[in-house]
Design a protein with these regions (language model features):
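Catalytic cores of DNA base-excision repair glycosylases
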Residues: 5-198, 202-211, 215, 281-282
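Intrinsically disordered, low-complexity, charged terminal extensions of DNA damage-control enzymes
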Residues: 1-18, 23, 186-351
Length: 351
């Protein structure tokens, strides 16, 4: 196949989006942006990116940030293991590399939370190294370009696709080439619908377009079925404060704060009262008002939430819990997006 780089780069320089991490592509900026964009759309991530950089402008600041502040800066993005790994890696970079990311692909790959794609993006965009950065967008472009029906999730197939990507990469413009492929996949060679083939700079070379098979590519492993998990939530209020409990240090939503809840069960009001009493909470005279149902989807788990709202007498928080007022809820304690329906309700109650 004819080398795609000239046409691709011409298109990219004319059509690329103006993004802050492209305008100032320092290693830290590229790293942060790539981690944020792993599970988040560009438009949704940009406000978080700007806010995060304003608070933590460099790697030493990230390394030294308090956990609650770090979680608060990430609140709303989800997948909190991303930001925990960011900080773990930042601490290693400060200890081993003087607070600057190393200009070495393998050294980047050894850092927590940095996989092959992210290491390639940092190395090529920020350091100009001729290495691949192959994400889902790039795999989709090349599956269609070569009309290749194999599973792109197969490790051997991905290695072969990566080799193809490198066959076309101009070493002196590795970063621009990698970004151009990502941009083409994001703006033109679209997933989940008809690609905009008439706008594609590679349209005359694309074998799937010629064969009429673009919509069926790339082939992927069918998604794993999510496990439905019932969750009972108790929004316990007292004197303008809500009772929060901290999740375990490991596992789903590790270390974050949440309303009192019980997973894998749907409890009646009486059963909820008994569970709260077992925590050491005095619910004397409390009226249990049903909460609206809420649903939240994790990667492989789907929470179906229900529960109760109640007000209890003034008392100390049980072990592992805190009482939090409206200001604390907004500024200090990070409630994951799984509870956004109930957080909105809480903020109307906590006057």
């Amino acid at each position: 196949m004819e080398n795609i780089a000239p046409a691709l780069l011409d298109w990219f320089y004319t059509n690329r989006r103006i993004l802050p991490f492209r305008e100032d592509p320092t290693p830290y900026h590229v790293w942060l942006s790539e981690i944020m964009l792993q599970q988040t759309r560009v438009s949704a991530a940009l406000p978080y990116y700007e806010r995060f950089l304003a608070a933590l402008p460099d790697i030493p600041a990230l390394a030294g940030c308090e956990e609650e502040k770090l979680h608060k800066l990430w609140e709303g993005l989800g997948y909190y293991s991303r930001v925990r790994n960011l900080q773990k890696a930042a601490k290693i970079v400060c200890a081993q590399y003087g607070g600057q990311l190393p200009a070495d692909y393998n050294a980047l790959l050894a850092l927590p939370g940095i996989g092959e794609y992210t290491a390639g993006a940092i190395a090529s965009i920020s350091f100009g190294l001729p290495v691949p950065a192959v994400d889902g967008n790039v795999l989709r472009v090349f599956a269609r370009l070569y009309n290749d029906p194999r599973l792109v999730t197969d490790p051997q197939v991905k290695r072969e696709f990566t080799a193809r990507v490198m066959e076309h990469q101009p070493p002196a413009k590795a970063g621009d080439y990698n970004q151009a492929l990502m941009e083409l996949g994001a703006l033109v060679c679209l997933p989940n619908g008809a690609p905009l083939c008439e706008q594609c700079p590679l349209g005359t070379l694309c074998r799937a377009r010629a064969a009429g098979t673009a919509l069926s590519l790339p082939q992927k492993t069918p998604p794993k079925a999510r496990r439905i998990t019932p969750v009972t939530v108790a929004l316990v209020l007292n004197e303008g404060r809500v009772l929060l409990q901290q999740r375990p240090a490991k596992g789903l939503l590790a270390g974050l704060w949440q309303p009192v809840l019980w997973e894998d069960t749907t409890l009646t009001a009486a059963e909820t009262a008994a569970r709260l009493a077992a925590l050491g909470l005095d619910c004397t005279g409390a009226h249990f008002t049903p909460l609206p149902a809420a649903k939240h989807i994790f990667t492989y788990i789907e929470w179906h939430q229900s529960g109760y709202f109640l007000t209890v007498p003034e008392q100390p928080a049980p072990a592992g819990c805190v009482w939090a007022g409206k200001e604390q809820l907004e500024a200090a304690y990070t409630l994951p997006g799984a509870f956004k329906v109930y957080k909105k309700l809480l903020l109307t109650k906590l006057l």
